[in-house]
Structure formats: C-alpha cells, structure tokens
C-alpha cells in the first residue's frame, strides 16, 4: 500500500525452461495467488495489479514464453482493480503490440520501457 493505494505485484512469466527461476506454470501461479488470499481479504482487494507477464488473452502472444496467465484474468474478474499493468511483451515483437486495452472495466497498460498513469484514473 502506498498513500492509500493498494498495489499487488506478481513477478514471473510462463514456464518455458523447466526449473528456470521466475518462470511458473499456470498451476504454480494459481498457488502463489492462493497464498495471498488472507492479505487480499484483509485489505479488501487491491487497486492496481502489477505483473511481469500479461494475462491470458489480454495483450499476450501465442508463443509459450509470452503467453499470459489465466490466474491474472481470474484476479481481475474477482477484484476489479482500476489498473492492470504488465510488461514482458515488447513493442518490437510485432504489429499486435497494444499499449492500452481494457479487461472488463479494468484499464490494461503494457508498460514496455515505461508508462506514466494518473491515479485515480481520469474518466
């Protein structure tokens, strides 16, 4: 939490080299999130979700290293944060790069290199 803004951060990407550091299976990521249940309940959720990898189907790519996590979609659906900020998918990876998107009412930002947001979000 920073100045009353509840921020949840989750590092790592989809596992594409077994045993590599900071790479997780979908099941692993769900387990990491389950460990946060008590904190999320106590804080009544979060306002901003910051991750390294994208969410599945939201600014991700088809190749395994750049696929997103369904676990992040589930988190966003449950807690409806104002922002979901991720990286890992770079602008030079192709024409499918999207800097901004939405998932439900959550604003999605690909923070490749850097990105500045206003909080609370301007309408």
Predicted regions and their residues:
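Catalytic metal-binding/acid-base residues of hydrolase active sites
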Residues: 13-14, 54-56, 88-92, 113-114
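Conserved catalytic scaffold of divalent metal-dependent phosphoesterases
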Residues: 1-67, 71
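Residue-level signal for functionally critical sites in structured catalytic/ligand-binding pockets
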Residues: 16-19, 86, 110
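Binuclear metal-dependent phosphoesterase catalytic core
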Residues: 2-3, 74-83, 90-123
């Amino acid at each position: 939490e920073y100045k009353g803004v509840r921020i949840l951060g989750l590092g790592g990407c989809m596992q594409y080299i077994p045993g590599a550091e900071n790479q997780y299976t979908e099941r692993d990521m769900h387990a990491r999130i389950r460990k946060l249940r008590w904190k999320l309940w106590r804080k009544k959720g979060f306002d901003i979700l910051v991750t390294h990898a994208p969410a599945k189907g939201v600014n991700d790519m088809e190749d395994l290293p750049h696929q997103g996590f369904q676990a992040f979609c589930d988190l966003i659906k449950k807690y409806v944060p104002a922002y979901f900020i991720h990286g890992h998918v770079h602008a030079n990876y192709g024409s499918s790069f999207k800097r901004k998107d939405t998932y439900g009412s959550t604003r999605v930002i690909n923070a490749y290199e850097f990105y500045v947001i206003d909080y609370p979000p301007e309408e």
